[in-house]
C-alpha cells in the first residue's frame, strides 16, 4: 500500500462508476495534475478550492444565478487573488530560506537541506532532477556539463 497526503497522487487513484460523479472526479484530477505540472506543489489546496467552487457554483446556479455571470465573477476573483499574491510574494534567496521552503514542500527537513545544497551547487539557472532509488537514504550527485540518458 502507498501512504501519501499528496493531492495529485490521491486524485489519480479515484475511480467512480456513476457517470456524473466520474465527471467531477475527472475535473478534480485535472485540477491536481495542472497544479502539479505548473507549481509542483499545492495540489491538495487546489483540489479543496476546486471542490468549493463547484459546490457553491452549482448551489448558485440552482438558485437561479446566471452561469456565465458566475464564470466572469470567478475570473475577476482569480485576477485579484493572483495580483495580491504576487504583491506579497517574497524572493527566496539564502540557502537557509531555500532549505526551509523545500522542507515544507517535501515534508522532510533532510530533503529540504539536500535540495538547498543542490541549488547552492548548480545556481538558480541549473537543473535539479529528483529520482527514486532502490537504495535507502538520500544522495546528491552532481553532473557538470551535459548528460544524455539515452542516445
UniProtKB/Swiss-Prot annotation:
Gene Ontology MF terms in the entry: ATP binding; ATP-dependent protein folding chaperone; isomerase activity
Entry keyword ATP-binding: yes
Enzyme class: isomerase
Pfam families, alphabetized: Cpn60_TCP1
Keywords of the record: ATP-binding, Chaperone, Cytoplasm, Isomerase, Nucleotide-binding, Stress response
Intrachain S-S bonds: none
Subcellular location: Cytoplasm
Catalytic activity line of the entry: ATP + H2O + a folded polypeptide = ADP + phosphate + an unfolded polypeptide
Entry annotated with the keyword Ligase: no
Biological processes per GO annotation: protein refolding
GO annotations of cellular component type: cytoplasm
Its EC number(s): 5.6.1.7
Binding site for ATP: 41-45
Function: Together with its co-chaperonin GroES, plays an essential role in assisting protein folding. The GroEL-GroES system forms a nano-cage that allows encapsulation of the non-native substrate proteins and provides a physical environment optimized to promote and accelerate protein folding.
Subunit structure and binding partners: Forms a cylinder of 14 subunits composed of two heptameric rings stacked back-to-back. Interacts with the co-chaperonin GroES.
PANTHER family noted in UniProt: 60 KDA HEAT SHOCK PROTEIN, MITOCHONDRIAL (PTHR45633)
Protein family (similarity comment): Belongs to the chaperonin (HSP60) family.
Protein name: Chaperonin GroEL
Species assigned in the record: Mycobacterium marinum
Gene designation: groEL
